[in-house]
C-alpha cells in the first residue's frame, strides 16, 4: 500500500465518523430507518459517503452530495441510483470505467485514473445544504484535492457542484474571477488544473433531454484528452 493510499484511508475513516452537522447526521439516520419501499429489506449505509477510485487519478468527477437512496443506501457515490446508471454507461463507453453499471460496493467496479466524490459527504434535506454545512465539509474536499497529486481535470456535475467547487477554490486561492456554468466549458484554475462544467445526469435532465448520452460521452472524451488518460 502506498503512503498516499494510507493517507486516503485515514481521511475516509474520518469522513465516515463525521458528526459535524447535526441536521445532516439526523437526516441520513432517518432515511436509513424509514427506507424506500423498493429497498425496505436492505440495510442502508446510513453514514457520510467518501470518494472512491484511483488515488493516482488525473481526472476527478464531482457531484454536490450523495443521493438519499443511492450513495446513502449503498455507501458509494453515484451508486444504486438512476444518475449513476446514466453516468457509468458513459464512463464505460469512453473507457474510464471497466463496466457500465454501479450497483453496490461489491460489484467489481474499477476506474481508470479517475476519482469520484461529492463536495458534501452527506445528503441534505431537499438536496439543499446550508452554507454552514458546506463550510464544515469543505476541508474534506480540499484534503482530497491535496492528496490527488497527479490530478489535472475536474468535471463538475451540475451547477451547484460547479459553484461550490469554485467557492472552495476562491477561498483557498483568494480568487475574484467569475466563472459561468455552461455545459462543456472549461476553465483554468489557479493550481493549473482544469475545471469543466457538465450538466448533471439527473433523471429530470435525462428525461427532458437537457443532457443526452452523446453530450456526456463527448464531454468525457475531452476530459480524458485534457488529462491525457
Where are these regions (language model features)?
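A polyanion-binding, active-site-adjacent surface
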Residues: 5-229
Amino acid at each position: 500500500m502506498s503512503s498516499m493510499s494510507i493517507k486516503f484511508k485515514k481521511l475516509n475513516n474520518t469522513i465516515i465518523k463525521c458528526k459535524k452537522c447535526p441536521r445532516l447526521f439526523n437526516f441520513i439516520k432517518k432515511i436509513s430507518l424509514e427506507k424506500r419501499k423498493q429497498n425496505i429489506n436492505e440495510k442502508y449505509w446510513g453514514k457520510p459517503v467518501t470518494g472512491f477510485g484511483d488515488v493516482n487519478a488525473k481526472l476527478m468527477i464531482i457531484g454536490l452530495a450523495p443521493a438519499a437512496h443511492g450513495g446513502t443506501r449503498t455507501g458509494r457515490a453515484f451508486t444504486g441510483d438512476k444518475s449513476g446508471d446514466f453516468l457509468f454507461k458513459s464512463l464505460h463507453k469512453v473507457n474510464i470505467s471497466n463496466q457500465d453499471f454501479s450497483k453496490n460496493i461489491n460489484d467489481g467496479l474499477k476506474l481508470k485514473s479517475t476519482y469520484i466524490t461529492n463536495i458534501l459527504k452527506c445528503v441534505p434535506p431537499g438536496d439543499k445544504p446550508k452554507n454552514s454545512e458546506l463550510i464544515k465539509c469543505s476541508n474534506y474536499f480540499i484534503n482530497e484535492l491535496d492528496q490527488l497529486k497527479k490530478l489535472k481535470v475536474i468535471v463538475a456535475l451540475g451547477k451547484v457542484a460547479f459553484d461550490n467547487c469554485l467557492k472552495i477554490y476562491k477561498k483557498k486561492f483568494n480568487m475574484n474571477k467569475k466563472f459561468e456554468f455552461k455545459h462543456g466549458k472549461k476553465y483554468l484554475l489557479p493550481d493549473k488544473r482544469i475545471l469543466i462544467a457538465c450538466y448533471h445526469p439527473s433523471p429530470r435532465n435525462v428525461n427532458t433531454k437537457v443532457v443526452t448520452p452523446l453530450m456526456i460521452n463527448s464531454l468525457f472524451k475531452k476530459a480524458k484528452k485534457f488529462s491525457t488518460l
